């Protein structure tokens, strides 16, 4: 290459928009980030302003370029990764949203989900979209907008409105309304996409009263969708060449492109994805079936499980229990004791996610004796994150019949060496922590870079996936099984609480 070229990842998250610029060696050379407003109109409702999402995201790219003096004509391509499921409906003639973006966390469509369950659609949804009937996904959010925004249904029927997840909205804005597109990973989170036939599901569209004319074209996660001159001087055109939802982008950034490879992102919650290749695995253990990326960005199947409380349980120790000054101190205190002294902490503050899906379970500390101190509770809380991860991975291995070779990890909590070592012990599996932990942005950049020839092959990318550290399991089998049995008993206590509560009433 005669002149230094770069690739950009736009990472549009739930609380902030970021731009990450990478060089050919996949080193991060510039990052810019802007937070935006969280809107809570009613209890359980969460919204964003789509124009603010666009304004913050476009300005981060300009800022990231300005920080390093990189010119726009040095950009080989742009990849986009985004908060999934968040739903935007806009008028294609005016370019204006008809309502705020309804965010993935928003629970306002619970009644619509109940109505669809009453119509006997649960099995159809699971078999054809891979998902469960839940307000989390986009479909019921679109229906809510059409049902509740004045004039929206009429405009939709007249072909004036477009739907998109955040990636679709950004590409539409970046191309001045020329391109209305999404990728397979984002489409698979809408509850409107048939993951068997890889097309929009007409039955689901009909059941929700959503005109097919609103839906974007669905493409691979690595191809040129259109050109933009965002942040460019003198009309420099830059190809938009990669799109993936945030968790699937992280899976790709971790180079989990073959069947049986899995990653866990330790954030507020934990998101586990396992690539199952070209085989669609329907879960019997409370997991979602979704679409991820194969080696060249082509659609591949994956299993997904979400743990509601990961790093958030450490924040609870800090903010509510006040037994930690900072989350980063948890490793120090956890290693001041040799064991948790028989204590288990089940952080079911908002119920339990996969594989239990128990909305009524509540947080529980069991096994307390007089000898238990705050260090034991801190250690047990960290252990609880690792046990929940094993719960999901056991379900994935049972569903897929694939034995996990290793677990690749990312997210804030992976800096905690105690947690990573305990995770390895509990799973009896190697845990691989990468040197670059910005794997979501990496995934989007890799997908775009492959599409424009910035990188030539997946092999070239795998050479760049340098590990910071490999954690190997130390525990003997008897000890591991005894501990895990104790965890399972503790989970039963968390689940029994609501049943006992009902008996008292």
Swiss-Prot record:
Highest rank taxon of the organism: Bacteria
Pathways per UniProt: Polyol metabolism; glycerol degradation via glycerol kinase pathway; sn-glycerol 3-phosphate from glycerol: step 1/1
Chain residues that bind sn-glycerol 3-phosphate: 14, 84-85, 136, 246
Regulation of catalytic or functional activity: Inhibited by fructose 1,6-bisphosphate (FBP).
Record's keyword annotation contains Metal-binding: no
E.C. number(s) listed in UniProt: 2.7.1.30
Keyword Amino-acid biosynthesis carried by entry: no
Alphabetical UniProt keywords: ATP-binding, Glycerol metabolism, Kinase, Nucleotide-binding, Transferase
Protein name in the entry: Glycerol kinase
Lineage of the organism: Bacteria, Pseudomonadati, Pseudomonadota, Gammaproteobacteria, Vibrionales
């Amino acid at each position: 290459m005669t002149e230094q070229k770069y690739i950009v990842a736009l990472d549009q998250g739930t609380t902030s928009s970021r731009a990450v610029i990478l060089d050919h060696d996949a080193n991060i050379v510039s990052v810019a980030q802007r937070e935006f407003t969280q809107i809570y109109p009613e209890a359980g409702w969460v919204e964003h302003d789509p124009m603010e999402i666009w304004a913050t995201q476009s300005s981060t790219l300009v800022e990231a370029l300005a920080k390093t003096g990189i010119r726009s004509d040095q950009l080989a391509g742009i990849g986009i990764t985004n908060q999934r499921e968040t739903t935007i409906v806009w008028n294609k003639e005016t370019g204006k949203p008809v309502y705020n973006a309804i965010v993935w966390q928003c629970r306002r469509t619970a009644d619509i989900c109940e109505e669809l369950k009453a119509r006997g659609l649960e099995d159809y949804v699971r078999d054809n979209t891979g998902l469960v009937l839940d307000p989390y996904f986009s479909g019921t959010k679109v229906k809510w907008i059409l049902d509740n925004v004045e004039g929206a249904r009429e405009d939709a029927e007249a072909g004036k409105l477009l739907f998109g997840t955040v990636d679709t909205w950004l590409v539409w804005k970046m191309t001045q309304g020329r391109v209305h597109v999404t990728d397979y990973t984002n489409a698979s989170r809408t509850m409107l996409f048939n993951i068997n036939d890889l097309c929009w599901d007409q039955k689901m569209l009909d059941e929700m009263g959503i005109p097919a004319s609103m839906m974007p074209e669905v493409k691979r996660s690595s191809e040129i969708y259109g050109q933009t001159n965002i942040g460019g001087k003198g009309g420099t055109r830059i190809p938009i060449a990669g799109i993936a939802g945030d968790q699937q982008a992280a899976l790709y950034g971790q180079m989990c492109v073959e069947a049986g490879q899995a990653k866990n992102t330790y954030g507020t919650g934990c998101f586990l994805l396992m690539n199952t290749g070209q085989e669609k695995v329907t879960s019997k253990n409370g997991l979602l079936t979704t679409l991820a990326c194969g080696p060249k960005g082509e659609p591949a199947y994956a299993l997904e499980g979400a743990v509601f409380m990961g790093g958030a349980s450490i924040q609870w120790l800090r903010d509510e229990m006040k037994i930690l000054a900072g989350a980063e101190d948890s490793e120090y205190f956890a290693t001041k004791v040799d064991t948790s002294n028989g204590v288990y902490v089940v952080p079911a503050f908002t119920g339990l996610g996969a594989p239990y899906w128990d909305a009524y379970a509540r947080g529980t500390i069991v096994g307390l004796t007089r000898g238990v101190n705050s260090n034991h509770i801190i250690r047990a809380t960290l252990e609880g994150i690792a046990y929940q991860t094993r719960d999901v991975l056991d379900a994935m291995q049972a569903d897929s019949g694939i034995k996990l070779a290793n677990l690749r990890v990312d997210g804030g909590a992976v800096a905690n060496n105690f947690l990573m070592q305990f995770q390895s012990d509990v799973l009896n599996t190697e845990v691989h922590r990468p040197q670059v932990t910005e794997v979501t942005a990496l995934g989007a950049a890799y997908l775009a870079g492959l599409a424009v020839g910035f990188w030539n092959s997946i092999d070239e990318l795998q050479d760049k996936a340098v590990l910071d550290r490999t954690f190997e399991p130390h525990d003997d089998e008897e000890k591991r099984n005894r501990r895990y049995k104790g965890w399972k008993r503790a989970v039963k206590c968390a689940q029994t609480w609501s049943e006992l509560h009902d008996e008292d009433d």
